[in-house]
């Protein structure tokens, strides 16, 4: 059985970071692939929520989602929050899988304690369990930002999901940051260095 891990909200200026872990066998993963499972960034919002429901209600799928708030990211740092979230998933699910696959190029040093960890760049495009984790994390992030958009409509969170789009940056410059913005280096840097917008927009 494979445990796949992925995140959503890493490059955002607002809202939480969500890290998800999904464990299932290859046969179950194939069932989800036949339903249209792929990297969450290539799915519509409606399709992500549809697959989220299928993953969460499937009897042979085990999942775990960890949320790290904007406040935690400001206080601890993004890297520390990612490591803590992945560690929490591993501590709760390591007995479920003999293989652990994380999207990206770093295991944040956790491979010393969990030697069966494998990091895979663009793993959400090649490993079904990582794609499933990607869908869950992104669906949780989508839902959070839609709820926050109802409170702060000027920032366009229903469209940009907290990323640093032109509209979002302009709203921050004009209205200031909300309690749900990350008041750390990322936020300040994006306002002072507009060139970073291109990088942030690619992450949407």
Curated annotation (Swiss-Prot):
InterPro entries: RNase_HII (IPR022898), RNase_HII/HIII (IPR001352), RNase_HII/HIII_dom (IPR024567), RNaseH-like_sf (IPR012337), RNaseH_sf (IPR036397). GO terms for biological process: DNA replication, removal of RNA primer; mismatch repair. Manganese or magnesium. Binds 1 divalent metal ion per monomer in the absence of substrate. May bind a second metal ion after substrate binding. CDD domains: RNase_HII_bacteria_HII_like. GO terms for cellular component: cytoplasm; ribonuclease H2 complex. It is found in: Cytoplasm. It is an enzyme of class 3 (hydrolase). Keywords: Cytoplasm, Endonuclease, Hydrolase, Manganese, Metal-binding, Nuclease. One of its GO terms (molecular function) is manganese ion binding. Its main location: cytoplasm. The keyword Transmembrane helix does not apply. SUPFAM superfamilies: Ribonuclease H-like. Its EC number is 3.1.26.4. Its cofactor is Mn(2+); Mg(2+). Residues 1-197 form the RNase H type-2 domain. Disulfide bonds: none annotated. It catalyses: Endonucleolytic cleavage to 5'-phosphomonoester. The keyword Transit peptide does not apply. Pfam families: RNase_HII. A divalent metal cation binds at residues 6-7, 103. Endonuclease that specifically degrades the RNA of RNA-DNA hybrids. Belongs to the RNase HII family. This is Ribonuclease HII.
